[in-house]
């Protein structure tokens, strides 16, 4: 008998589970358009409305090439995902694929790792959604207390920046807010914080205290995560309709940005040669690509809905590849408009697209873009939470998590409601108390690891099951998977040792859970184990 740690889930069992249509199975209601919309909904959001600003400061007008490079890395992984999604149409995404090819331990690791992409990704996006919601309130001259608008650390940093602005204005009446000289003065004040600055910042927060520490709780992030959770509990069909409506809205806003913004593009801003187009050279373009990778996270969530697709063998590859193509084209176009409207050195980092239009005097357009960003981030949260709950559902059905809880299907809505509520609550809490930057970097490295494992798994399964029917085949194997491994592995390397350390700690926690519970309850490693059916 082989090592149970590397026991593989037989393809025959996977295909039998795919064909099974029992009382407690998920409803098959999603077609190719809805699956593509889910993918677009997961991808378009923080990247196009927020991260393009910082990417421009690395790559200059070459940001367009940064999106191409980042998209290529995702495309290699997407082609591998598409082969698995068509061949193994089960909820679970990379987790299920790893179980069939690399064994149970690796499958557990990737399932645990996917929590970084989906649940923590939803937390990241809920915090970003909150920032745009607060910006929307500001447009109507409404203010939230800082301690209810941000987590503690972000609230204090925001208060310090606001006080620094006040000090800059009072110290030099010639400074004009918004100019580079003003911003430099504010940065100088914050770089050498004085007792007066810190005291006034704490007064501005005006937050209640627990055990002597000021409270910081991002209330909008908490509420929006719970609202999305409630929508997911009601049902996948209703969730898909809600998501499709939002996707139509935000794609319309993106097309609006491209159409109107192109009228204000100055070709001179793109530069006249390679050195002005890519002021930091190819290394700057590569750095921009690594940073904006978050912009592409989410397309793989389409594969987690395999058991809810009407014709998964045909529709899942369409949904995965079409959503990635649509998003890449839109990203490149927006990057071109952004760096054409504003010189790359003047691109705003916090709200680059909206600010570019505001600086042109197009305030109404800027407001529309802010609303589009809110819609975009809402749909990203929906798809990420959806993906997480379906991965947990698959792991529970395999015995790696308690089935009575994580695979419990609502008798009316036919959704895994218990694990949906748990995941939504955890995402809401993390998003409301944790700085967005810290979660975002963890999401990046976790997602890249999943991509690398899927690329490896395609090559393994081609060797171990060469005769298996494949409705969609990844082209040019092993070239495409190897390129996916190299490209995504390089971006993992660029994320630095701190994030590697965080990833290792997270995986160690997962391994403790596996050896304490999962390996003893696994259906594959313990085929004679008697299961108690779900009520």
Give the predicted meaning of each segment.
Residues 14, 21-27, 63-64, 143-221, ...:
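Helix-loop-helix junctions that connect adjacent transmembrane segments
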Residues 135, 253-257, 391-392, 443-470, ...:
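Hydrophobic alpha-helical segments of multi-pass membrane transport proteins
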Residues 130, 213-264, 320-321, 440-453, ...:
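Membrane-interface loop-to-helix entry segments
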Residues 28-39, 103-116, 221, 279-292, ...:
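Select transmembrane alpha-helical segments in multipass membrane proteins
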Residues 49, 113-131, 291, 296-310, ...:
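Membrane-helix boundary/coupling elements in multi-pass transport proteins
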Residues 213-216, 228, 404-417, 451-500, ...:
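C-terminal membrane-solvent junction of multi-pass transporters and transport-like membrane proteins
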Residues 1-52, 57-61, 75-79, 88-91, ...:
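Membrane-interface "cap" regions at the ends of multi-pass membrane proteins
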Residues 48-158, 323-326, 330-333, 505-508:
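Extracellular loop-to-transmembrane helix junctions
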